[in-house]
Structure formats: C-alpha cells, structure tokens
C-alpha cells in the first residue's frame, strides 16, 4: 500500500508519525524492548504524539525478529502461524546512549540509540571478523504509524474524535543491484523488484497479479530473507514507492518481521523451514503420471474405462486416475457421494480400477452447496462459518447458496473427515483439495473466535491440514499427499501443490513455471502444473511441449477444463511423446527420491531457480525460463511450435578441472559454462543438461516409480570424480527410509582410471551397479 506522493508529500488524508528516537530500552535475557518516539526537541514533544514499542527476539540461530506495536490494547483472537523456537543462542551488548548489538549466530542487529538518530542495521560476518556486510535495516524515517482519514472507518464517531484507520509501517533498506524473489506462487515477473504485492489469497488464475498461494516471505540476492509474521493482509511495495526500500504495511496496530541470514539461498531456505516446518515427503507412486476426467467434461464409467484402455493399448504408464468435480451431482458439492446416474456401482467400479494397479484421487472443496443433503446437518449443528447475527454465511458464487465449513470447530472437522474416511474405505488414495481462497472476512464469526481478517489466508492452511492429517491417520506419512491449490505459511508440511487455472498457451506455460519457481523459494519442494493448460484446448504442438515440461516437474498431471487431455485426441504422435517422457521420469525415480529426501531435510525444492544452485554466477539471477531439476539436471522447456530455445549454461566450480556439461540425449554433445546457447528441438528432445562432476542414479528397468530401485540400478557419471561420493537409495515403500548407501569413487587400474560403485551391505559386489561414465575415462 502506498502512502506517499513522491519524496515530500503524503497522499490525501494520510498522516504518518515517524519514529526517530529511542526513549528508553530494557534488556531481559534474550529479549530487548525499546520505546520509540518521534524526533525530540524538548519534553513537550512527548505529548500528543504516537509511540511504537519494538521488541527484538531470536526464535532460532541466524534469525532475528522485530515486533512493532502501536496500541497494545487490542484483542488477540488469532490465528497465529506455528513457529519453531529455541533459546540460548543470542548475545546482547549495550553501550549506554550510543548503541545496542543483538547477535544470533552470524547475524547481528545494531541499533543506534543515540538521541534522535534511530537506526536498525542488520549485518553478517564470520566470528572474529571486524568487517561486516550490511544486509538490510531501518534508516531515516522508516518505522512509522500511519493514519488514514479517507476510509469508511474514519466516518464513524468514536468517543469525542473521528477515528482514522491505522496501519503499522516498516521500510527495509535495499542495496545497489539487490534482487528480490518469492512471496509465494506468483505468476508475474520472477524478480519482484518494482512490484506492488498484496499477501491475500485470491482465485485469480495464473494470468494476473493475484495468487492462490501467498507467502509473506521474500529472499534477497544480498544474503537474507524477510518473513512478515502476519496471517492477514500484508502489503509490500518492493522498490515501487521508495526506490531504495521495501515498504511493508499491515492494517492495525502491530507488525512483526524476521530477518533470516544465510551464506547462500539454500541456507536461507533451511533456516526458513527450520522456523516454519519441514516439507513432508510423498509416496513414490505419486511421481508417476496422473490423468483426470477434466472439469466440465461429460464423463461416466464408460468414458473413464475407455481412457484407461487407451492408455493400456498404447503402453502408456499411468499411476493415478483422478475424478474431478462432477463425480458428485451438480449443485451438491460437497456431499461426498458419487452421482448414481453416472456411477451406479461406485464401490464396485473403484475396486475394478484398483485391480488395474491404479491409485485413485478425488476432488473436494471446503464448501457445501444448499442443495447438498449435508447442508441442513451443517446448519443445525453449527458446522459452518456464521454471520454476526448467527445465520449461516452464504452466497451463490461457485455453488448456489453454498456455506463454508468452519475448521476451527473440532466437531465440524470430525464431521468433514468422517466423509473422507468413508471414501478412503472405498479405495480413494488421495484428495485434490481445491479452492479455499474466497473466504469471507467481514461481518462473520468463527467457532473459536478467530479474527476473520487474519483467518482469510490462514483458512487454506487449516483446510489442508485437516485433510492431510486424516490421510496420515489411516495411510501413514509415507503414503499420504494432497493435490492442493491454496496455502499459507507452513503449508509445505501438507504437500503437494499445483499451479491452478492456466490457459492453453505458451505464455501460460511460462507463467506457470515462474509461479512454481517462486513457490519453491518458500520451501515447497513439490509442485505441478496442468499439462496442456486448463482453459481452452491446446494445439498438438503445445500439448507435446507441455508434456515435456510437465514430466520434468516433481508431479505430473494431465488436466483440463472443458476438454480431455488424453494424448491420442491430439494425434498419435502425442502418445509417443508422452510415453517417452513418462518412461524417462520413471527411470529417474531413484534420483528424485534422493533429491526429495534432501529437500525434506533442507527445504530445497526439486525444481529450483538457477541462482539457488549457482549463486556465484550473477548471470543466473534473472533466469526464469529454465531451472535445475534436482542438483544435477538443467532443464530448459521449449516455448514455441518451432522448437527454438535459448538457455544459459552456468559456470560451476567443477569446470575448473576442465569438466563440461553434457546433453542427456547425446553424451558426446558438450557445453561450456558461462555461455548462452540457442538450439532447435523436435518433440523427442529438449535441453536437458547433466552437471559436470555429477553422479545421477537411474533405473531403466523400472515400470512404475514404486518398483524395486536396486534391480537394474545404474549411475550416470559426468566427468571425473574428485572425491568419494555417497548416494542414498531411498525405499520407495517408505520414502523417509534409506535402503542402501552407494559409494562412488575413482581408482587406478592397469587399463587406466575407472569409476566403481559399491552398495553398503553387498560384500565385494562392485558390479551390482552399472556405471555409465561419460565425459571422461572408460565405461564399466
């Protein structure tokens, strides 16, 4: 939100009380409390003006929080994000009348407490080093309380004065050339500088500035991240009001933010997920291909069976089949009952699908239409969000007369999850948790008294948590996942998430990728898009290009709106492309499971921006049409019918030993780091480059992701190995568990150097793993 007109003027009706002085402070163990006020000329300036209390804490090492409070008399009805904390890792030094230093790990906050010289400076540096690097901070006029007399609130008489709408404002410094990223799944420009962003979940598709998944956390190229700990609406002006600052404002009396330090983007993400929760793992079968009924298409048992037979006849591997909205009768979403006209024997039919070896997914949302038999029950028992007068909140957008389930009511949660458990008893393996963005936030009440405005974003988290925990209670953590559209802070604990409603265009394919890369910067390690696009019918060329991209995402789903996405309706050559892409992804399962386990521990996503993997190469920071798929594979999707694609190959430390990137499809084709390349590809290839010095476990014998990874296991080694490498082979049945640790190294032989791979527990059997050594030496 913008409050100024240039450097000198304020917008009409705006007043800002800027904090310029530390009136007093108190140090209590790991906490510093300061009372801030305006510029003080004499004692009279303490009257008729605002103060802001600042509380400095450190929830975890390397993270420092500042909480700003104007009025402290408000009700705290929640909700609050769940954050992990520890103690005993801070150091505080205080030079009276001059400064205060608050240290947490390498991160230090230096507060200038000299009269009328208030400044906060966050710096980083190694222990014992005098020279420290500034990350961000508050300089002149950057902490304030804003009053707006133009809002409806200001027209209401409150006591003897008219009340202004208040906002708490914090402006954080930026350095020259600094770039900003993240803030959830955002589909606009990948680099966020110059943008105005509202953290407010909306159902806006992928071609707008709105977002389904708003996360008030951004990462800076300067070596830090900022998390605004506020579940309600957060407004950020990222160099779009003050060109040297990020302006953060929230409606109301308090604002809390945390600065998270890291040597590189991966360390920042690790600390971020230490604070907000580690991403959960998903079952191996979920990495396979998903097929859906699409949205508004007419389908029945016969339609679905025909699709599945078509996949079998064409030797197209399929892991999951999904029933979208119209598995239920129209106007009755959700009643959790199969439409008997279309599925007269739902239980029997689901059993027959399971006999095909398929996992089954089904669509749900957190709403109950008035025509649903469940509406009267929910109304009678108080399971829905209510208006202030006690009536059920309803509207006609989406489902006629629909109500919204109140997940702050434990009884409502039990009622809702009881229907999910019944569906799981029928054979449903997972749920697509759609919607939860259009949540009312005015003139309503929740069962637990939560603040409606703070619940608007948080609601999606509750919804997904309730469904996910229902699944884990029955199937266990290693066999549970969602397919969710909306989320909030901490939602990485309830995977997977997909990009929402995109158009069937190359532009939408590119914006989907931007959204997925941005979301990954919040520790969401799994992500998918609607292959082929959701809105409209994709031309065959686009379908094939999106298949290539979609099968190089962590999760891969064929889904549309009014048209089906089975490949043969776009041409039999589309089936060939799909088959090749699915089989390639299945062969990569050992690699993907190992990368996912690392992401579970560290918060590093499977699909990651180039700068995350190569922060020393400044050319990687603006790149948003290519990505790293795990640590080893560079992917550059093709965004044109003609197949022309331009991509950048980053410099890597490994290249100092004259190692080179190589093509996945042609191991004789080599690429130098630090260069741009333009190529033309048909539909059987795209740029997939293998990192120099990397060891990638693969298995071409696998027919499904959950197959035995050891039978047929091999490794692809690019170039020489400077030191012994350990590769974890993850159990596909329990993706938290490591089956074997493979040790890969070089050794001298009579015939020269060779690469060997040993599996722990396999005595003397060096040949149990096939080695495909490219770029150097011999193949064994």
Curated annotation (Swiss-Prot):
It holds the Pfam family Glyco_hydro_31_2nd. This is Alpha-xylosidase. It is found in: Secreted. It comes from Emericella nidulans (strain FGSC A4 / ATCC 38163 / CBS 112.46 / NRRL 194 / M139) (Aspergillus nidulans). Disulfide bonds: none annotated. Its EC number is 3.2.1.177. Induction: Despite the presence of an amyR-binding consensus sequence in the promoter, is not activated by isomaltose. It catalyses: Hydrolysis of terminal, non-reducing alpha-D-xylose residues with release of alpha-D-xylose. GO terms for biological process: xyloglucan metabolic process. Its main location: secreted. Keywords: Glycoprotein, Glycosidase, Hydrolase, Secreted. GO terms for cellular component: extracellular region. GO terms for molecular function: alpha-D-xyloside xylohydrolase; carbohydrate binding; hydrolase activity, hydrolyzing O-glycosyl compounds. Belongs to the glycosyl hydrolase 31 family. It is an enzyme of class 3 (hydrolase). Catalyzes the liberation of alpha-xylose from the non-reducing terminal glucose of xyloglucan oligosaccharides. Glycans are attached at residues 48, 84, 247, 298, 443, 718. The active site is at 434, 437, 501 (proton donor).
């Amino acid at each position: 939100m913008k409050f100024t007109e240039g450097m000198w003027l304020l917008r009409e009706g705006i007043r800002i009380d800027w904090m310029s002085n530390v009136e007093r402070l108190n140090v209590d163990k790991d906490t510093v409390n300061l009372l801030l006020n305006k510029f003080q000329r004499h004692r009279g300036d303490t009257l008729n003006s605002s103060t802001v209390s600042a509380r400095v804490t450190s929830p975890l090492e390397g993270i420092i929080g500042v909480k700003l409070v104007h009025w402290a008399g408000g009700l705290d009805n929640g909700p609050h994000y769940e954050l992990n904390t520890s103690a005993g890792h801070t150091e505080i030094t205080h030079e009276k009348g001059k400064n205060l230093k608050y240290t947490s790990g390498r991160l230090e906050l230096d507060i200038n407490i000299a009269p009328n010289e208030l400044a906060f400076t966050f710096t980083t540096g190694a222990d014992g080093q005098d020279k420290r690097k500034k990350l961000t901070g508050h300089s002149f006029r950057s902490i304030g309380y804003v009053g707006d007399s133009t809002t409806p609130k200001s027209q209401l008489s409150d006591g003897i004065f008219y009340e202004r709408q208040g906002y708490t404002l914090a402006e954080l410094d930026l350095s020259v050339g600094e770039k900003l990223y993240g803030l959830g799944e955002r589909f606009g420009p990948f680099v966020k500088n110059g943008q105005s962003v509202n953290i407010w979940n909306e159902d806006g598709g992928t071609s707008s500035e709105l977002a389904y998944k708003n996360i008030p956390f951004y990462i800076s190229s300067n070596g830090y991240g900022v998390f605004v700990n506020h579940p309600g609406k957060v407004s950020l002006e990222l160099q779009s009001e003050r060109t040297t600052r990020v302006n953060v404002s929230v409606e109301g009396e308090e604002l809390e933010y945390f600065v998270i330090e890291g040597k590189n983007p991966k360390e920042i993400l690790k600390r971020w997920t230490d604070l907000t929760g580690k991403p959960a793992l998903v079952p191996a079968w979920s990495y396979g291909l998903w097929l859906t009924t699409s949205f508004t298409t007419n389908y029945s048992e016969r339609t679905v069976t025909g699709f599945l037979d078509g996949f079998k006849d064409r030797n197209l591997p399929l892991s999951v089949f999904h029933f979208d909205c119209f598995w239920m009768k129209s106007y009755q979403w959700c009643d959790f009952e199969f439409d008997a006209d279309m599925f007269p024997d739902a239980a029997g039919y689901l059993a027959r699908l399971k006999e095909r070896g398929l996992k089954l997914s089904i669509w749900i949302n957190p709403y109950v239409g008035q025509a649903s038999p469940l509406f009267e029950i929910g109304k009678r028992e108080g399971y829905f969000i209510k208006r202030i007068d006690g009536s059920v909140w309803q509207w006609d957008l989406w489902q006629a007369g629909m109500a919204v389930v109140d997940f702050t009511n434990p009884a409502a949660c039990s009622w809702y999850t009881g229907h999910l458990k019944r569906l799981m008893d029928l054979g449903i393996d997972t749920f697509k948790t759609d919607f939860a963005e259009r949540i009312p936030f005015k003139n309503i009440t929740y069962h637990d008294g939560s603040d409606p405005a703070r619940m608007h974003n948080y609601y999606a988290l509750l919804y997904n948590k309730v469904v996910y925990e229902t699944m884990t209670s029955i199937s266990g953590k290693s066999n549970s996942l969602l397919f969710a559209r909306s989320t909030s802070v901490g939602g990485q604990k309830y995977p997977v998430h997909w990009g929402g409603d995109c158009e069937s265009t190359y532009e939408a394919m590119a914006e989907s990728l931007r959204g997925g890369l941005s979301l990954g910067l919040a520790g969401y390690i799994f992500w998918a898009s609607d292959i082929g696009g959701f809105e409209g019918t994709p031309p065959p060329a686009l379908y094939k290009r999106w298949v290539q991209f979609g099968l190089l995402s962590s999760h891969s789903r064929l889904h549309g709106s009014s048209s089906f996405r089975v490949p043969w309706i776009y041409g039999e050559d589309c089936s060939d492309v799909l088959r090749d892409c699915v089989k390639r992804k299945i062969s990569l399962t050992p690699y993907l499971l190992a990368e996912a386990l690392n992401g579970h521990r560290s918060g590093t996503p499977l699909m990651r921006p180039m700068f995350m993997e190569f922060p020393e190469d400044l050319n990687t920071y603006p790149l948003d049409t290519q990505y790293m798929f795990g640590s080893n594979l560079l992917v550059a999707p093709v965004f044109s019918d003609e197949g022309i694609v331009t991509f950048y190959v980053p410099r890597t430390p490994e290249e100092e030993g004259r190692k080179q990137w190589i093509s996945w499809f042609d191991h004789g084709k080599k690429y130098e780091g630090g260069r741009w390349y333009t190529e033309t590809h048909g539909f059987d290839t795209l740029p997939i480059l293998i990192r120099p010095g990397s060891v990638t476990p693969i298995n071409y014998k696998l027919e499904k992701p959950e197959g035995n990874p050891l039978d047929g296991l091999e490794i692809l080694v690019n170039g020489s190995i400077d030191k012994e490498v350990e590769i974890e082979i993850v159990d596909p049945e329990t993706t938290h568990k490591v089956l074997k640790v493979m040790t890969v190294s070089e050794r001298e032989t009579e015939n020269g150097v060779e690469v060997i791979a040993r599996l722990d527990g396999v005595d003397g059997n060096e040949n149990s793993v096939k080695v495909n050594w490219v770029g150097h030496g011999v193949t064994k």
